[in-house]
Amino acid sequence: ACVPVYEECGTPKKRCCEERPCK
């Protein structure tokens, strides 16, 4: 299942199925 993760650190922007979640 796709998990929404943050596209950019500290931003409300989210993307689905990000290869590498922001750490």
UniProtKB/Swiss-Prot annotation:
A GO cellular component entry from the record: extracellular region
Disulfide bonding pattern of the chain: 2-17, 9-22
This protein's UniProt keywords: Calcium channel impairing toxin, Disulfide bond, Ion channel impairing toxin, Knottin, Neurotoxin, Secreted, Toxin, Voltage-gated calcium channel impairing toxin
InterPro entries: Spidertoxin (IPR004169)
Primary localization class, coarse: secreted
Family (UniProt): Belongs to the neurotoxin 02 (plectoxin) family. 01 (Tx3) subfamily.
Pfam families reported in the protein's UniProt record: Toxin_9 (PF02819)
Subcellular localization, as worded in the UniProt entry: Secreted
Tissue/organ expression: Expressed by the venom gland.
Secretion signal span: none
Sample GO molecular function, one term: ion channel inhibitor activity
Protein name: U3-ctenitoxin-Co1a
Chain's role: Antagonist of L-type calcium channels (Cav1/CACNA1).
